[in-house]
A protein has these predicted regions:
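N-terminal alpha-helical targeting/anchoring segments
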Residues: 38-94
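Amphipathic alpha-helical
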Residues: 255-276
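Short acidic, glycine/serine/threonine-rich loops at helix termini
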Residues: 40-44, 158-176, 192-198, 245-251, ...
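Dual-mode signal for accessory low-complexity, basic/Gly-rich regions
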Residues: 110, 269-462
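Structured beta-strand/loop patches that form or line metal/cofactor-binding pockets in enzymes
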Residues: 22-58, 150-171, 368-393
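Acidic low-complexity segments
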Residues: 2-7, 11-17, 24-39, 84-173, ...
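A generic local secondary-structure boundary/capping motif
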Residues: 18-20, 47-51, 125, 137-144, ...
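Short beta-strand elements
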Residues: 52-64, 171-199, 307-309, 395-402
Length: 462
C-alpha cells in the first residue's frame, strides 16, 4: 500500500523540510526519509532474533550562482545539525567546477493524489506474526524433507519520503514493504540439492513464508546432482532469474546516464525492434503486483510508460538533472542523489512484463529438453552496450527431460546478452511475481520465460 499527500494549502507539512529550506536563499530541495524495519532471519533451520531498525536522515541540494550544485546529508536534525548541513552543501556548490543545466526546481504540482488509507506498521505485532509464519514454514519443510536445512529472510517495513523545494513543491509518500525468501537444501544427497523461492508485496498478507516454502519445495527432485558440460541450452528462466537480469538491464542500459556516456544499447537501438515482438515491458510504479511508488526522489510522479513496445525499445529514464541537460521532461525516475545510488542516475526500478498465457507446466512442456534456471547470482557486465553479462546459476538448477524436471544439475556460468535472451524468448508465463531486494528499492514484476540457445561458458561440480 502507498499513501501520497500534498502540503496543506501549499505550505510544507513536514517541519524538518521547512526548517532546512528556511536556512537558504538559493534554489534548493530537501529529501526527508524515515524508515522503520523488522528483519527476521533464518539459518540452519532456526529462527534468529528479530532485528528492529529505525532510520531517519535528510539530504539537501542547493544551486548557487553560476548554476553550481552542492549536496549534503545528515542524520542530525538538531538546529546545529541542520545549519551544518546547509553550510556544507553551499560550500560544496561554491567549490564545484561543473555547472548543472538545472536552474530552478519545479513548483507545486497538480497531480492526482491517491489515498489508500494506509495504516501504521506495528513492528511488534509483525514480529510475532512473522515468527509464527517462519515456524510454520520450518515445520512444512521438516515434514517433507526430514534431512533438510533452511535459510532465509523476512523483511517488513514502512518508509516515508518527504520532498520539498524552494519553489513551493511539497510531496510525500508512505509505503509498506513486505519481502521474503527461503533457501531449502536436501542434505540426504551430496552435494545438497537446493530449491529457492521468494516474493514481495505491499500487502502484509501477500508474503507468506509457508507459501514460499511450498514453492521452494515443490520442484526439488530427489536425485543426485549431475554435472553438465558447458554449451548452448534451451532454458526456462524462473522469475528470480529474470528479475536479476531486468535490474542489470535497468542499471546498465535504460537510464539517461548510460545513454549520455554512450554505454547504453539505446544509443543504437532506440525506436528499433530490439527484443521479441510479442514482449512489452513497462515501467509501472502503480502495478498492484509490485511495490507501488507513485513519486521519485525529486518529488515528481513516476510515469507509467513503455520501455519496450512489442519489442521496440523506447527512451531512457530521466530525473530533473538529466532531463534539463537534454531539454525533455523528467520521467520521475530520480534515485537518492547521495551514495550509493547517485552514481546510477535515473533508472527504472519497477520493470513490469505484460504476462503471457503459459503455465509453468506448459513452459516445461514446450521446453521439452533443457535447463530450468530458478535463480542467478554474481551477475556482472562483460560488455555493457551489447548487454552481455556473466553470472552463475544458483539454488534450483534442474535438468528437464520430456517436459518434466528430472534431476538437479551442477551450477553453470552463463555468459549471454540480456537483449539476446529476450530476443530469443519463445514463450512467457502467465503468472507474475514481484522479486524485490530486501529494502524494496528495485521491485521488478516478472514472469517465467522460455528462451532458446542460451550460452553457458563454464561449469562447476556442485
Amino acid at each position: 500500500m502507498t499513501r501520497e499527500e500534498p502540503g496543506a494549502d501549499g505550505s510544507p507539512w513536514d517541519p524538518v523540510v521547512s526548517r532546512i529550506l528556511a536556512r537558504t536563499s538559493h534554489p534548493a530541495d530537501v529529501r526527508h526519509m524515515t524508515e522503520r524495519w523488522l528483519t527476521l532471519r533464518l539459518a540452519n533451520s532456526q529462527i534468529y532474533q528479530p532485528i528492529h531498525e529505525v532510520k531517519e536522515y535528510v539530504s539537501f541540494r542547493v544551486i548557487v550562482p553560476g548554476n553550481l550544485m552542492g549536496l549534503a546529508t545528515t542524520t542530525d536534525l538538531s538546529e546545529g545539525g541542520i545549519k551544518t548541513l546547509v553550510d556544507s552543501a553551499e560550500a560544496m556548490a561554491r567549490s564545484s567546477q561543473e555547472p548543472v543545466a538545472l536552474t530552478a526546481f519545479p513548483g507545486p504540482g497538480h497531480e492526482e493524489v491517491h489515498e489508500t488509507g494506509l495504516a501504521a506498521v506495528d513492528l511488534g505485532q509483525i514480529a510475532e506474526s512473522a515468527a509464527r509464519s517462519a515456524a510454520e514454514a520450518l515445520g512444512t519443510v521438516a515434514r517433507e524433507f526430514p534431512t533438510s536445512r533452511v535459510a532465509g529472510v523476512y523483511n517488513a517495513g514502512q518508509v516515508t519520503l518527504s520532498v520539498g523545494n524552494s519553489s513551493g513543491r511539497h510531496r510525500a509518500v508512505t509505503r509498506n514493504i513486505y519481502q521474503g525468501s527461503l533457501l531449502v537444501e536436501d542434505l540426504s544427497v551430496d552435494p545438497p540439492v537446493s530449491g529457492w523461492a521468494e516474493g514481495a508485496s505491499s500487502d502484509p498478507h501477500g508474503v507468506s513464508l509457508p507459501e514460499i516454502a511450498h514453492r521452494a519445495l515443490e520442484r526439488i527432485p530427489r536425485r543426485k546432482v549431475s554435472p553438465l558440460p558447458p554449451g548452448s541450452y534451451d532454458v526456462v528462466f524462473g522469475a528470480p532469474a529474470i528479475a536479476e537480469l531486468m535490474n542489470m538491464l535497468s542499471m546498465g542500459g535504460l537510464g539517461a546516464f548510460s545513454v549520455e556516456e554512450g554505454s547504453s544499447f539505446l544509443s543504437e537501438w532506440r525506436d528499433r525492434e530490439t527484443i521479441a515482438p510479442h514482449l512489452t515491458l513497462w515501467e509501472d510504479p502503480q502495478d498492484a503486483h509490485g511495490l507501488p511508488e507513485p513519486m521519485d526522489y525529486d518529488g515528481l510522479p513516476t510515469l507509467r510508460r513503455k520501455l519496450f513496445d512489442h519489442g521496440v525499445a523506447r527512451g531512457p529514464a530521466h530525473d530533473l538533472l538529466t532531463a534539463a541537460r537534454v531539454g525533455v521532461p523528467s520521467t520521475g525516475n530520480a534515485l537518492p542523489p547521495e551514495a550509493p545510488y547517485g552514481q546510477l542516475g535515473p533508472v527504472p526500478r519497477h520493470v513490469t512484463f505484460e504476462p503471457g498465457t503459459a503455465s509453468h507446466e506448459e513452459l516445461l512442456t514446450r521446453l521439452g529438453r533443457g535447463i530450468l534456471v530458478t535463480r542467478l547470482h554474481y551477475v556482472r557486465f562483460v560488455h555493457r552496450q551489447r548487454t552481455i553479462v556473466t553470472g552463475m546459476t544458483r539454488d534450483g538448477t534442474y535438468w528437464v527431460e520430456n517436459g518434466k524436471v528430472h534431476h538437479p544439475v551442477a551450477n553453470l556460468r552463463m555468459t549471454e546478452s540480456i537483449l539476446g535472451i529476450l530476443r530469443r524468448t519463445e514463450s512467457t508465463g502467465r503468472d507474475l511475481l514481484c522479486c524485490a531486494d530486501e529494502r524494496g528499492v528495485f521491485a521488478p514484476v516478472v514472469p517465467e520465460i522460455l528462451t532458446r540457445g542460451v550460452a553457458f561458458s563454464s561449469a562447476t561440480s556442485f
